[in-house]
Amino acid sequence: MNSRMDALQAAVLLAKLPRLESWAAARRAVAARYRSHLAGGPVRLVADAPGSEHGYHLLVARVPDRDRVRRTLAQDGIETGLHYPVPCHRQVPYRGYASVDLPVAEQAAGEIVSLPMFPHLATEQVTRVCEQLLECVEAADSDVA
């Protein structure tokens, strides 16, 4: 496979490059709004590494009963992503190595979901996503109780 960039792709990306930092800053602001809305609740956002500055290409959360939550949110017009459904130790390149039990990785792979994230996501949109997400997760908790 040849994955080199052609001249047109290079020109487009070169034109976008000056905006990269402002887009990353906007994504960090959106992530901060998510963190504010979801703090202390049943939805856990993946933590930033201390001393780092996250680019927030994705905003990954851990939720119980992920597949039902995704279906319910989709019915409400909120699309989510599933970017890491298989833990690393279960992926093809690692199958030849010693098999180990990694229950935390297995659990995380079953709970993680990518929430809507783009630089210009409005405060009202973040609020709606968080409210619907919390309602959905809390409804599942009350069904179990």
Question: PLM features: residue spans?
Answer:
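PLP-dependent aminotransferase class I/II
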Residues: 1-145
